[in-house]
Amino acid sequence: TWDGTEYSIAEWNADQNLNSAMINSVNWYFENLDRQSGIADFLTKINYGNCDLSGGLTSWMQSTLKISPVEQIDTLKAFYINEYGFKDENVKAVKEAIEISDGFYGKTGTGKVKGHEINGWFIGFAEDCDNVYFYALNIQGEDNASGSKAAEIAVEILSDRGIINYEN
């Protein structure tokens, strides 16, 4: 539930559910989930990157928690087949929340420092009749290294390879 705090992103200034929070990257929603779920134990359970939350929960996106693209893919594959033993309906809900188009799933992430987008992620998977293709793209720079830019690059690569047929 939104606590009334005014954020610079209008979509954040309302109650959220998983789908709306995923679509609008509502950080406060996920920070609340992290607090409620005991995120440190959870990260250890799924072996997520270096599992280091010493930088705090509100700044973990650009802080001490680090993960490589290969580790992201390993985590995503394990999630996809539910190696972690989550409730099936929860796995399904997350997959539905990150579905971009039929058979194409992904989530962006952007790390900002002093208002500059310095770390962009786009991770996900694409399904066809015979295969599942997992991907994780990370771009870094002094500015304009956003999740949306990472998504543009990933879509171009996946399209060029004939894995997806997607137009934004």
Tell what function each PLM region has:
Residues 1, 21, 135:
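Active-site SXXK
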Residues 1-2, 60, 121, 125:
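Tryptophan-centric aromatic hotspots in well-structured domains and transmembrane helices
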Residues 4-13, 17-18, 30-81:
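Mid-domain, small-residue-enriched loop/turn segments at the edges of structured enzyme/sensor domains
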Residues 7, 35, 77-168:
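Structured C-terminal helix/loop/strand segments within mature extracytoplasmic catalytic/sensor domains
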Residues 21, 43, 94-98:
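A generic structural signal for nonpolar/aromatic side chains embedded in well-ordered alpha-helices
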Residues 25:
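Acidic/His-rich structured neighborhood in mature extracellular/periplasmic domains
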